[in-house]
Curated annotation (Swiss-Prot):
Name of the encoding gene: rfc1
Start-end of Basic and acidic residues biased regions: 1-11, 55-111, 118-130, 227-241, 361-382, 465-484, 499-509, 548-558
Binding site for ATP: 898-905
Species of origin: Dictyostelium discoideum
Name of protein: Probable replication factor C subunit 1
Alphabetically ordered keywords of this record: Activator, ATP-binding, DNA replication, DNA-binding, Nucleotide-binding, Nucleus, Transcription, Transcription regulation
Domain BRCT: 637-727
Composition bias type Polar residues, residue spans: 577-588
Ranges of Low complexity composition bias in the record: 242-252, 310-339, 400-422, 438-461, 485-497, 589-616, 743-765, 799-829, 1391-1401
Function: The elongation of primed DNA templates by DNA polymerase delta and epsilon requires the action of the accessory proteins proliferating cell nuclear antigen (PCNA) and activator 1. Subunit 1 binds to the primer-template junction.
Chain segments carrying region Disordered: 1-639, 721-829, 1334-1401
Assembly with partners or alone: Heteropentamer of various rfc subunits that forms a complex (RFC) with PCNA in the presence of ATP.
Pfam families in the record: AAA, AAA_lid_RFC1, BRCT, RFC1
Subcellular location, record wording: Nucleus
Length: 1401
């Protein structure tokens, strides 16, 4: 590097403006530039850095030396070249590894721009070597002129040239020649290419190899990847100081070479005609490495005949990577001549962050033979490589990608200067930069630039082989692991062959993407490019681009079935998608008009494809309601129009709920799937469609449709109304239709179903009549035709015409339809296809008995559903027959639980009969109290069946058939959870006692497994829980019953009947019988309305669940649920409303959960006021208001998903506990008042006496053990407490804490109980307080007080106390009552009576 630095000093001294042209010197003198120039509005001035100065100059000089030696012959062909070079302040970039290129570059503000560049150093020498150059006026002032004068003159010429060009060419061309910092309007013809014009400068042939190599090194250092900017920046209108060397754009450096092939136009101020389009190419110094590598592996240049292909032909050609061969030349570029029919093509790359400019001058065609020779030379040295095709398949949308690009690659070859770790400019220009040439494109000359030294002399390669299926921004985000292997050898001459497995590294492209400067430039480019879209040749872009891109993708990745539309959704940068879609018809959109079929079998709708990955926790609180619910009518179509089609509904629909969509599908004969099954035909998608369902639907090939498309699918099958202009089977001119009078015999209308050539009619009996033509001129219908008269065509005499075909869709002759309605009385399925089993076909028809009893299962095979449960139940019964010892784990009873009407009782009876048991059934209507059950069941095991006494003798053997047959009995207790009231009190406890010692099976049936009445019974029974049978299991049996009874129903009607009965088979059969006896005709349309008119009994828990889930639109339905049990349903709502997850849609979206709960609680508080008024004042007229405030309003706020199962109201338990404790306090108060020690009220008893008594009843036992027993008994006697009062005091004072008796030893507890029960205590008995006799005179109240034997002798012998006791008769209770000697009552010493012994001292 030191040696290179020494070599660099010479070119600086040779040129007077070298201090301004070189990068380092330009950075040092940045303050000398005029302030306030417009270029500073775009770029910020950064600090100078001269670290890489020597290396750059050395490389430039060496490169120019080599290029002059090899391409001396091509120096004569150089044209005027303007170079805009973007330099970056980096050092030793040539030594960086590919991994270093991937690392983000340091974000720097834009450097100040100098008008001169490193190439000005050798401008005089280039003029000498270029005798044919006549465009000296186009060059800026060279070395001798001062910097300010040179800038002014250059800006003046550029400004004039731009003004002149605007009048003769498109707006993009004028901006191309202008001296603005960003030539943006030149982009508009190619919306995928960003044009940046930093320095407009005359490009001449370098003097020495030193300057050429220095420039090469300088350009290599400035190579970087750009991401498309976002923010707009103000476009300068003032004089712009155009520095000669570099301007940085978010650390991404490029050189843009403008090649003007019109060498004859020597006047710089002369406007450029439209045919003379400048060619602007991005030039980077390291392209010398890149192009040599490409030279060996790129495609063979096309022959002149191939370059004549038009845009339409490119759709059939495979996209081939165009080789780059112009880097071999060091002379000014002689661009490809293009006919004036083709406008200037500028590619604006929005999807890709590459900023590139391409413009082609289409006038010059000279020296084409020499260029073709150069191409043939390249052809020999660079054979076609198939991997180049895949390399060209980038997802960057380039308008023209065909073989004609090969003929233009020479003019764009200087653009191949980007590092291969990113998307190089040469990648863009080689493949897509030039549109197909319609004529005159056969003479192509490789472009030769002084900034690209010869590869043969300096074979440095930096271009790597990029093998990518298709370049797109989406793949950048999706596949960051696709990397590009870049081989960089700064000073080696070895050529590295490209690897076919190398991938394009998309990660590097977006380095420095967030720079505010980049975003500002990008927005400015987008804004200005939109204004020039009208100048784009749309036909030569969209067709070519989309076709070739698809072919490239299919070739590179045949298994990639993902469309670009889907990959865009997965991207992280929405900026590129918005920009690419903002061009409308003029933009090249990868998703627009695909001409190559993809491997997806499903045609997805743009509305159905989600734009973002749905959040899995989005509907954690419930799915929202449709935003436009109720805005669309239900579809009407032909019967069974969806038969044979399977649908899957996903997402939130616009108008219908998910259940409503399922109902519509089933109504018209379709099937609903819950997941993406193989037979799936359609996925009806809404907002936030499920990701797994969407992927599964695509895999199975299902078509993705929206809600509107689904409704249209049904509506379009509806028969069209009668048209008076229909043509018939007789070809007639189309005259004015004349209506005919309606005959009186017409009794019903008809509906047009299809457009056929005959008129199909039905007679009054419903039999289809023959097809008859309608005669014209008869003034009416034929006599044999039933139905309304239809307008017929008036024809010439005798000519007949037929009206549109008519078909009656209603089977009953009395039913009529109009042309806009559909008759649906005919079932979707043929009743002939229903198979009636033998067990049903043998039953006589009619309504003599209930169908439930008539069609009750006769064998176990007739039971629908739960086969495994019944099999296990049969095995349990088998153990009672076996002689082997019973399993100890087997219990003596079984508990069959499940919803009503699913066959619990029928299964129990059938299985008992099958296993040889005689069932004794106790139904809920029977008395099942403790005494009644004991009376009925205690001696069942000893009973004998009456049939045993009537044995029959076998004629063959002469023995009694029943003699050796043992009769077994099973007890069936149906609806065990229905025990209630005093009549059944104690029945469950008695049953449990019988089960423990029973020698026969007990079969208990219940509906509510979680009922508190069954809680104790569950511990002694084997649980067998039955489930509701599915619709498929039940529908076949219900259809068989309906067919046997002569009904015409459809599977849809059966489903509605079954679901309306809450999966109750018994109720469904009753409903079918009701429909059969009714005179009303039922069909798919009116069956739902008819079923809603029927009342069904539901439990309070089911009613509360439906209220919490039901939509607020039907208040009457919610009130019906409330009145099912108006005392319990509000309590269930109050218990579970806090646990319900609101849906969050509709009106709920305006509030958060806390606000919704608060408003629901306020409504419940108001309802309590109405409930109190109803209970105390008997104001039953407030009951509907109570239902609204307690159920409807709270459920409207928190409607959603309630917890299942619903919790039982805890209020009832708490109320019961509070009542019990109040009773404890009342009893304690009464017992304490019976003594003369206290007279307190309830509050004082609870607050003061209970804590004190607790301490004195427990602490002596804890501290003194057995010695404290006497003290505890004395306290209890002083206050008249019983043993139950002691336990109640502990319960009242514990409040959920630990039992204080746990600290008392077990031996002390037992001793206390024995001693307390062994002694006599005064007890309180309210019944003894009443006096005997009506008068009550002479009755001693104290006589009624009971005394317990065994009282202490001390109390008996106290005479003084005895007299005091007599005086205090009003006392309710006395501890001891001692009779004096004068008492006449007999003394008893042994009997337990109300008197005690009296002793005298």
């Amino acid at each position: 590097m030191a040696k290179k630095a020494n070599k660099e000093q010479s070119p600086k001294k040779t040129s007077p403006t070298s201090s301004q042209g070189s990068t380092a010197t330009k950075k040092k003198t940045k303050t000398s530039e005029p302030a306030g120039t417009d270029i500073r509005n775009f770029f910020a001035v950064i600090k100078p850095s001269t670290s890489g100065e020597n290396v750059k100059n050395d490389l430039f000089s060496k490169a120019k030396e080599d290029s002059n030696k090899e391409f001396s012959l091509s120096d004569k062909e150089n044209d005027d070249v303007k170079i805009i070079s973007n330099k970056k302040d980096t050092t030793n970039n040539d030594k960086k590894k590919p991994s270093e290129n991937k690392s983000p570059k340091k974000k720097e503000p834009s450097k100040s721009i100098d008008l001169t560049s490193d190439e000005d150093k050798s401008s005089s020498e280039e003029d000498k070597k270029k005798p044919s150059s006549s465009s000296s006026k186009k060059k800026p002032s060279s070395s001798s002129s001062s910097l300010p004068n040179k800038k002014k003159s250059t800006l003046k010429r550029l400004k004039k040239k731009r003004d002149d060009s605007s009048s003769s060419s498109s707006s993009s061309e004028s901006d191309f020649d202008s001296g603005s910092d960003l030539d943006i309007e030149s982009i508009d013809q190619k919306p995928k290419t960003i044009t940046k014009k930093k320095n407009l400068k005359r490009k001449s042939k370098p003097d020495s190899s030193s300057s050429s190599e220095d420039e090469t090194k300088h350009q290599k250092d400035k190579k970087i990847k750009l991401k498309t900017p976002e923010k707009k920046i103000e476009e300068p209108e003032k004089k712009v100081e155009i520095p000669s060397s570099t301007s940085s754009i978010s650390s991404s450096q490029k050189k843009i070479v403008y090649s003007f092939e019109d060498s004859e136009d020597s006047d710089a101020d002369k406007p450029i005609p439209p045919s003379k389009k400048p060619s602007a190419v991005v030039v980077n110094a390291p392209s010398t490495k890149t192009f040599e590598k490409k030279k060996e592996n790129t495609d063979i240049p096309p022959s002149p005949s191939k370059t004549k292909e038009t845009t339409s032909t490119t759709t059939d050609t495979k996209p081939i990577k165009s080789p780059s061969k112009s880097n071999k030349s060091t002379t000014p570029t002689t661009t490809t001549p293009i006919t004036t029919e083709k406008k200037k093509i500028a590619q604006l790359e929005f999807e890709s962050p590459i900023v590139s400019i391409t413009a082609i001058d289409t006038e010059k065609k000279k020296d084409g033979n020499k260029d073709n020779k150069n191409k043939e030379k390249d052809k020999d040295s660079s054979p076609f490589d198939e991997m180049e095709i895949e390399e060209s398949k980038s997802k960057t949308i380039m308008p023209n990608n065909n073989n004609n690009n090969k003929s233009k690659e020479s003019s764009s070859s200087t653009t191949n200067s980007k590092n291969n770790t990113s998307m190089n400019d040469d990648l863009i220009f080689d493949d897509f930069a030039f549109s197909p040439i319609k004529s005159g494109s056969n003479k192509t000359t490789p472009s030769k630039s002084t900034s690209s030294p010869s590869k043969e002399t300096t074979p440095i390669k930096t271009r790597s082989k990029t093998v990518e299926s298709k370049f797109d921004d989406d793949s950048i985000f999706d596949s960051p692991d696709k990397k590009t292997t870049t081989t960089t050898a700064s000073n080696t001459k070895t050529k590295t062959p490209p690897s076919k497995k190398d991938k394009f590294n998309h990660d590097i492209i977006f380095e420095e993407s967030d720079t505010p400067l980049n975003r500002a430039i990008e927005d400015s480019i987008v804004k200005r490019s939109l204004s020039g879209l009208n100048n784009i040749d749309k036909d030569s872009k969209t067709t070519t681009t989309t076709t070739t891109e698809k072919k490239q993708k299919l070739k590179s990745d045949p298994f990639d079935t993902e469309t670009e539309e889907e990959t865009e959704d997965e991207g992280d940068e929405p900026l590129y998608k918005q920009q690419s879609s903002s061009f409308g018809s003029g933009s090249i959109n990868p998703t627009a008009t695909p001409t190559t079929p993809t491997k997806k079998p499903a045609a997805t709708s743009t509305n159905a494809t989600p734009t973002k990955k749905p959040n899995p926790f989005m509907y954690m609180n419930g799915r929202p309601t449709p935003p436009n619910k109720g805005s669309k009518p239900r579809p009407q179509g032909k019967e069974n129009c969806l038969r044979g089609k399977v649908f899957l509904v996903s997402g939130v629909m616009d108008c219908f709920e998910r259940d409503e969509m399922h109902d519509i599908i089933k109504r018209w004969g379709g099937k609903v799937a819950k997941s993406a099954v193989k037979l799936l035909n359609y996925l009806v998608s809404g907002k936030d469609v499920g990701e797994k369902k969407l992927e599964g639907a695509k895999k199975v090939g299902a078509k993705i449709i929206t809600e509107d498309e689904f409704l249209e699918m049904i509506n379009k099958t509806l028969p069209k109304p009668v048209s008076t202009t229909e043509t018939t089977h007789i070809s007639l001119p189309t005259p004015t239709p004349t209506p005919t009078p309606t005959p009186a015999s017409s009794s019903s209308s008809s509906t047009t179903t299809t457009t056929t050539t005959t008129t199909t009619t039905t007679n009054s009996t419903g039999i289809k009549g023959p097809s008859l033509p309608v005669r014209s001129g008869s003034g009416g219908s034929s006599t044999g035709i039933k139905g309304p008269s239809l307008p017929v065509r008036s024809g010439s005499g005798g000519t007949t015409s037929s009206s549109p075909p008519l078909t009656f869709t209603s089977s009953p002759p009395t039913s009529t339809t109009t042309a806009t309605t559909t008759t649906t009385s005919s079932p979707p399925i043929s009743m002939a296809s229903v198979i009636v089993p033998k067990s049903i076909s043998t039953i006589p028809k009619g309504h003599d008995i209930l169908w439930v009893e008539k069609y009750r299962p006769k064998v176990i095979e007739d039971i629908v559903g739960n086969p495994g449960i019944f099999q296990e139940f049969g095995k349990w019964l088998d153990q009672w027959n076996s002689t082997a010892p019973r399993d100890a784990s087997k219990k003596n009873a079984v508990l069959l639980s499940g919803p009503p009407g699913i066959g619990k009782t029928s299964a129990a009876l059938l299985i008992c009969k099958q296993k040889g048991f005689e069932a004794i059934e106790l139904n809920a209507s029977d008395a099942r109290s403790k005494s009644e059950i004991k009376r009925l069941l205690s001696g069942v095991s000893d009973n004998q069946n009456i049939t045993k006494f009537f044995g029959t003798t076998n004629q063959d053997t002469g023995k009694d058939v029943q003699a050796n047959k043992k009769i077994k009995t099973a007890i069936i207790l149906d609806e065990i959870d229905g025990s209630s009231g005093n009549s059944d009190r104690g029945g469950i406890a008695e049953i449990i006692g019988l089960i423990k010692k029973s020698k026969m099976p007990f079969i208990c049936l219940c509906n509510d497994y979680y009922s508190s009445k069954v809680t104790s019974l569950r511990n002694h029974c084997m649980d067998l829980k039955l489930r509701k049978p599915t619709l498929n299991q039940v529908s076949s049996r219900l259809l068989a019953i309906a067919k046997h009874e002569g009904m015409k129903v459809s599977s849809y009607m059966i489903e509605k009947v079954y679901t309306s009965s809450h999966s109750d088979i018994r109720q469904s059969i009753n409903t079918l019988q009701m429909m059969s006896r009714s005179k009303r005709d039922y069909n798919n349309d009116n069956v739902t309305q008819s079923l809603q008119e029927k009342d069904f009994d539901i439990s309070p828990f089911t009613a509360a669940e439906l209220i919490l889930r039901e939509d607020n639109s039907n208040i009457n339905k919610k009130l019906d649920y409330f009145f099912s049990d108006f005392s319990l349903v509000p309590l269930i709502i109050q218990e579970n409303y806090l646990k319900t997850r609101p849906y969050g849609g509709g009106s709920q979206s305006k509030y958060n959960d806390c606000e919704l709960i608060s408003m629901a609680a306020d409504a419940l508080s108001d309802s309590d006021q109405f409930g109190r008024a109803i209970g105390k004042e008997m104001a039953w007229n407030l009951l509907p208001t109570y239902g609204v405030t307690s159920c409807i309003i709270p459920s409207g706020y928190i409607r959603g998903s309630p917890p299942m199962p619903l919790s039982f109201p805890s209020y009832l338990g708490k109320y019961s506990n509070a009542s019990k404790q109040q009773r404890f306090v009342r009893e304690l108060q009464l017992h304490m008042r019976s003594t003369s020690n206290t007279f307190v009220n309830r509050d004082e008893t609870r607050l003061y006496y209970v804590p004190m008594l607790k301490h004195h009843l427990i602490q002596p036992l804890v501290q003194d053990d057995n010695d404290g027993i006497e003290n505890v008994i004395n306290v209890m006697d002083e206050y008249g407490l019983t043993e139950d009062d002691r336990n109640n005091i502990i319960e009242l004072s514990t409040w959920g804490k630990e039992d204080p008796l746990k600290d008392v030893k077990t031996q002390v507890k037992s001793a206390f109980t024995r001693k307390f029960r062994s002694t006599s205590h005064a007890i309180y008995d309210v019944s003894l307080l009443s006096s005997k006799g009506s008068g009550g005179g002479g009755t001693n109240i104290a006589e009624g007080y009971e005394e317990v034997e065994g009282e202490s002798q001390n109390q008996i012998e106290e005479e003084d106390e005895e007299t005091e006791e007599k005086d205090s008769l009003p006392n309710l209770v006395k501890k001891s009552s001692v009779k004096s000697k004068s008492d006449t009552k007999p003394k008893s010493t042994k009997s337990k009576s109300t008197t005690t012994k009296s002793k005298k001292k």
